[in-house]
């Protein structure tokens, strides 16, 4: 049986979750990452994606995050999200609205670096929309 550790998911609006869990799968910018008890200390950035949490009771919860940072220690993990909502609370058109707003901004962007970031954001949001719509 896997050891438990404390996990907190925090957005600027609220504390979404603070409980003992057995594992958390996070969309790190380097790739999907599974965090378990006694994980090596790590700090990583989070890209838009789905965070899957397996609680100590065995219940699985999924949250959509729109970027942030994760601070991982052997005894716990704190994910500070730019924005986050439980998957079941996500309005289906929210991702489409974000994609369309980024596309409109891209049309008027002048700097290459800004265009590149917007294109990357659109790609991530489009992928996330596909993942969320499958569930």
UniProtKB/Swiss-Prot annotation:
Biological source species: Rhizobium johnstonii (strain DSM 114642 / LMG 32736 / 3841)
Known partners and oligomeric status: F-type ATPases have 2 components, CF(1) - the catalytic core - and CF(0) - the membrane proton channel. CF(1) has five subunits: alpha(3), beta(3), gamma(1), delta(1), epsilon(1). CF(0) has three main subunits: a, b and c.
Coiled coil: none
Principal subcellular localisation of the protein: membrane
Gene: atpC
Compartment(s) where it occurs, according to its Swiss-Prot or TrEMBL record: Cell inner membrane
Membrane topology: Peripheral membrane protein
Name the record gives this protein: ATP synthase epsilon chain
UniProt keyword list: ATP synthesis, Cell inner membrane, Cell membrane, CF(1), Hydrogen ion transport, Ion transport, Membrane, Transport
InterPro entries the record matches: ATP_synth_F1_dsu/esu, ATP_synth_F1_dsu/esu_N, ATPsynth_dsu/esu_N
Single GO molecular function: ATP binding
GO cellular component assignments: plasma membrane; proton-transporting ATP synthase complex
Primary role: Produces ATP from ADP in the presence of a proton gradient across the membrane.
SUPFAM superfamilies tied to this protein: Epsilon subunit of F1F0-ATP synthase N-terminal domain
Family: Belongs to the ATPase epsilon chain family.
């Amino acid at each position: 049986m896997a050891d438990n550790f404390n996990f907190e998911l925090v957005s600027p609006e609220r504390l979404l979750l603070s409980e003992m869990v057995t594992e958390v799968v996070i969309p790190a910018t380097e790739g999907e990452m599974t965090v378990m008890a006694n994980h090596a200390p790590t700090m990583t950035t989070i890209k838009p994606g789905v965070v899957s949490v397996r609680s100590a009771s065995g219940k699985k919860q999924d949250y959509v995050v729109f970027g942030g940072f994760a601070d991982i220690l052997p005894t716990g993990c704190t994910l500070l999200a730019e924005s986050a909502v439980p998957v079941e609370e996500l309005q289906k058109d929210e991702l489409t609205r974000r994609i369309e707003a980024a596309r409109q901004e891209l049309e008027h962007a002048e700097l290459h670096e800004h265009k590149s970031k917007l294109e990357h954001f659109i790609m991530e949001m489009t992928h996330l929309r596909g993942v969320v719509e499958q569930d």
